[in-house]
C-alpha cells in the first residue's frame, strides 16, 4: 500500500439499529418514497415480523413507543435484520419503481418491504 492508501479506507464504526433504520429510510427515499410511506413501512414490517400492530408490540413488551431501544433485544434484532435486507432489496430496485402517482410509487415500495418481511419472518424463532 502506498502513502495515500489510508485515505481509501472509510472510517469504521459499530452499526446499531438507528443506523440500519436510517439506511432503510434512505433506500425508501432513493426509490421516490414520500409522505406517510415511512410510517406505513414500519406498520407493514411489524405486522409481518411480529403478527401485531406497532402499538400492540410496544404495549405487550413494555416498550416506549417510538423508542426501539426499549423493545426486547430479539425484537430489536428482528427489525435490524429485516431493515438491512429490505434496504438491500430496495437499493437493487432503484430506478425500476414508478407509477402515475405518489401513491403508486409508495405502494410498490410497501410491497417490496412486505415481501422482504415475509421472508425474514421465516427465519425468526417465533
Locations of regions flagged by a protein language model:
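Positively charged, phosphate-engaging catalytic surfaces used for nucleic-acid and nucleotide handling
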Residues: 1-126
Amino acid at each position: 500500500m502506498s502513502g495515500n492508501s489510508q485515505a481509501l479506507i472509510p472510517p469504521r464504526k459499530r452499526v446499531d439499529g438507528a443506523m440500519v433504520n436510517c439506511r432503510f429510510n434512505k433506500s425508501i427515499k432513493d426509490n421516490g418514497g414520500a409522505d406517510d410511506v415511512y410510517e406505513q413501512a414500519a406498520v407493514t414490517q411489524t405486522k409481518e415480523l411480529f403478527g401485531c400492530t406497532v402499538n400492540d408490540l410496544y404495549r405487550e413488551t413494555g416498550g416506549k413507543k417510538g423508542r426501539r431501544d426499549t423493545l426486547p433485544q430479539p425484537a430489536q434484532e428482528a427489525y435490524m435484520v429485516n431493515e438491512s435486507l429490505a434496504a438491500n432489496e430496495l437499493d437493487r430496485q432503484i430506478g425500476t419503481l414508478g407509477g402515475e402517482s405518489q401513491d403508486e410509487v409508495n405502494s410498490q415500495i410497501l410491497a417490496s418491504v412486505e415481501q422482504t418481511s415475509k421472508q425474514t419472518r421465516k427465519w425468526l424463532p417465533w
